[in-house]
Amino acid sequence: MKQAAYLQINKNDNVVVCLRAMHVGEEIKTSHGIIHVLRETPAGHKILLHDTNQNEPIIKYGYPIGHAKEPLKAGEWVNEKNIKTNLSGTLEYEYQPRIMPLEIEHEDRYFKGFLRRNGEVGIRNEIWIVPTVGCVNGIAERLARQLEKETQLKGIDGIRAWHHNYGCSQLGDDHENTRKVLRDICQHPNTGGVLVISLGCENNQPEDFMKLLGDYDTERIRLLITQQVEGDEVEAGMNILRKLYHKAAQDQREEVSVNKLRIGLKCGGSDGFSGITANPLVGAFSDWLIAQGGTTVLTEVPEMFGAETILMNRCLTPQLFQKTVKMINDFKTYFLEHGEPVGENPSPGNKAGGISTLEDKALGCTQKGGHAPVCGVLSYGERIEVNGLNLLSAPGNDLVAATALAASGCQMVLFTTGRGTPFGTFVPTMKISTNSKLYKTKPNWIDFNAGELVEGTEMQTLRNKFIDKILAVANGEKVQNEVNGYQEIAIFKNGVTL
């Protein structure tokens, strides 16, 4: 099957997206006749369908993605040089609910996971070492390597020390955010045993931190305060870790329904194909999982700017709508208070890949949330309380946002990318390429190829293949970031460092 040269995403769009590089003089058929390409235009970029005056809107996905900086001719390459964002400051919004039922059949699908005492299910069974403060990162890493050498990982999936720079010299929200995220990591179902390791004199006082965990299982979570150890703190830590290991190594996978899955949705290194391949594929999966009773979480609040009303009007209640409005405007205020414009998000890589404005990026980004109603809105560091589609307050930064998704309780993060990235957070971070070229050139980074969608594969066919892949990972198949050992955490910081 011959691949199409371009795609008009919505019938109301005044641009098409090039599915391959297009050359001067090539024809594009429109409802008003044939136009000719005026400039060499790379794949993923936009070509204008009709003459447009200065300040007139550029329409993509059926919505404005900005306005023309100057008069533009039909056939012109539309990019960041001739289009400008419409975004500015905070806005007032009106709740106009547009909630559509998901007409997706229920399927009896299962995976084998680790059932935890609180009813949550893990897809990994790892030993984690969680520093309360960055001062003990080195000890934590040494303990992890020593336990790995001693046990050879028999009966468990991994041993990880989650390094970070915080836990001291922080005040206010930064201090609380650090404590919340570290608490969430300790309570995550993907771990079968946690050693909380403290220095002892830090702002994040160990005894107070342990109180945040509530009624925790003392056979699964233990504390070591290194300043209180007389002698070798490494040996003291190993004595605790051996007990945690022997407990976790007894855990066995059990068959559970897919409604136990909580999946984070993230994109990074996006390009012009993100909104027509990988993000819609993830959105189709999200709708399917929610129809089965499962949960997905969408974040990257600054990358919702320009598409936020779509999500707001999918909120189930006026209260959820108001929480979403606050989430959006709080992030805009955060930008403005730091002297940053709200619409200058697209990175050099985004622009090179065909994304020209933040609206362009946002309308593609939010497609990862499919069409399901918004059932929950979470603050940073807050854990999932209701099944269905949740929105989470966190920035667009890949490491910070992915960590926040995992901290909310997601057992896995689906990460779409057009440019490619190797990183992963503290849960399996599955990379989905927007184009086949990336999938072929970076097989050591990428786990699944959504580029097939512009090469003749039907969405339903690829979605089903994608579901099978996700369930295989839930059953224990490693994704590339796990194979490579690229796993880390990053915590959101807003204020001063003492």
Which residues does each predicted region cover?
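Metallocofactor- and cofactor-centric catalytic cores in central/energy metabolism, strongly enriched
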Residues: 2-412, 419-422, 427-498
